[in-house]
Design a protein with these regions (language model features):
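Alpha/beta-hydrolase fold catalytic core
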Residues: 1-38, 62, 160, 230, ...
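Active-site loop/oxyanion-hole signature of alpha/beta-hydrolase fold enzymes
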Residues: 65-102, 227
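Active-site nucleophile elbow and catalytic-triad environment of alpha/beta-hydrolase enzymes
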Residues: 157-172
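Conserved alpha/beta-hydrolase "acid-adjacent" motif
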Residues: 189-194
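Catalytic histidine-centered segment of alpha/beta-hydrolase-like enzymes
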Residues: 213-222
Length: 241
């Protein structure tokens, strides 16, 4: 089956990737820097290189792990996708590499994966979830409608994932005990009410809405995300935003 070409992001770092086998799939990832582990999870149809500028700034203080999610980049194509499987990929990734006190930064689908994983493992002690939703209806109606039309013609498994899932329950959000920052752009594809709800259901979570930003404008090949991460992990708690 041909891979989806929706929002295909090209590899710009030309780095040497490492391979790991978790949850019955082979994942490829980049590792750089030294210090506390930070795992950056990209969104649907992308690969880890969207975080090129972010990782460059973080690796002076942290060990950055940038995996390609299953079915993305160079990682194994599985043909069918579910967010809970991808969250299990992340949990086993942390376990197999023996990463503890990890910070997970997820964008869009990566944010969903981060929420699900953080509810199930204490290896994640900090979480930054950007542009995430707990259900398809958390997307703005025009966005969700566009995805359904796209899927009707493409039958893309990755597009089907977004229009049928996630299904994260409030009880699961309440199980997240990591220090959590929920981020969205002012003009995000995610409804503001959805972002507010996620932040309200996670104990002690903080929320930042970035003025003038869209769903991925502060993420993809941008240094703005690194500033947010550094401030959050340094305990500045969004003072600049």
């Amino acid at each position: 089956m041909k891979k989806s070409t929706w929002i295909r992001i090209t590899n710009r770092r030309n780095e040497k990737l490492e391979k790991i086998h978790v949850n019955h799939v082979d994942l490829f990832y980049e590792k750089a820097g030294q210090g506390r582990p930070v795992v950056l999870i990209h969104g649907n149809g992308e690969d880890h290189t969207i975080f090129d500028r972010t990782a460059h700034l973080l690796e002076e203080k942290f060990t950055c792990y940038l995996p390609d999610s299953r079915g993305h980049g160079k990682s194994q194509w599985t043909g069918e996708f579910h967010y809970r499987d991808m969250a299990e990929d992340l949990i086993q990734f942390l376990e197999k590499l023996n990463l503890r006190d990890a910070a997970v930064v997820g964008f869009s689908d990566g944010g969903i994966i981060g929420l699900l994983a953080a509810a199930r493992t204490n290896r994640i002690t900090s979480l930054v979830a950007c542009g995430a939703n707990t259900r398809p209806e958390g997307l703005r109606i025009l966005c969700l409608t566009g995805m359904k039309i796209h899927h009707f013609f493409s039958r893309s498994p990755l597009m089907r994932l977004m229009i049928r899932e996630p299904d994260i329950r409030d009880e699961e959000l309440a199980e997240i005990h990591a220090d959590t920052l929920i981020v969205a752009g002012q003009h995000d594809l995610i409804r503001k009410s959805e972002t507010d709800h996620i932040a309200s259901e996670i104990p002690g979570a903080e929320e930042v809405i970035l003025p003038g930003e869209s769903h991925g404008s502060y993420i993809v090949h941008s240094e703005k995300l690194a500033e947010i991460i550094l401030d959050f992990l340094d305990g500045k708690r969004g003072e600049k935003f």
